[in-house]
Amino acid sequence: MIFLDTSFLVNDEIQLCLKKTVDGNREKNWLPAYHFAICDKQGKEMGTCDLRIGHNLSTYYGGNIGYRIQEEYRGHHYAQKACLLLFELAKKHNMDHLIITCNPDNYASRKTCEYVGCHLVEIVELPEDNNMRLEDGETEKCIYQIELRGS
């Protein structure tokens, strides 16, 4: 896969600053990914986000997009703003939909998914052999999806 220029991932409040790209790994079932710092206009890091390109069982449970906002910057919708920028990058990779997942008790993340236009597909129990279950003790995920075509 060819990684694209990401300098356009900016709006009036934030910019996504590319930290690294990671090639996919078929053996580990990993998809190619972009990893960003979510920064203010002066370049101060307020959180991180990533976009995984493509779809497989791992992204169904783990999502195409991940984000984390540092505690002191929460409440300003920075995750929402980052997701909207990542949608544009996903479109450039001809992705027609994206999955975002979160834990059922993560109400802030659930609101972020709803704010950006995702719909809840299901709340699912993670398979016994899923890494999030084995390594982090997580048992359930909310699976949200957004259609990118026509948006």
Which positions does each model-derived feature cover?
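Conserved beta-strand segments that form the floor/walls of ligand-binding pockets within enzyme
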Residues: 37, 50, 64, 68, ...
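Conserved active-site alpha-helix within GNAT-family acetyltransferase domains
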Residues: 105-122
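Conserved GNAT acetyl-CoA-binding A-motif
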Residues: 91-101
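Acetyl-CoA-dependent GNAT
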Residues: 3-60
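Short beta-strand-to-coil "C-cap" segments at the C-terminal boundary of structured domains/repeats
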Residues: 19-22, 144-151
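Conserved catalytic-core motifs of GNAT/GCN5-like acyltransferases
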Residues: 101, 119-135
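Short hydrophobic/aromatic beta-strand or adjacent loop that forms the aromatic wall/cage
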Residues: 33-35, 137-143
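Conserved acetyl-CoA-binding loop-helix of GNAT-fold acetyltransferases
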Residues: 67-69, 75-89, 111-115
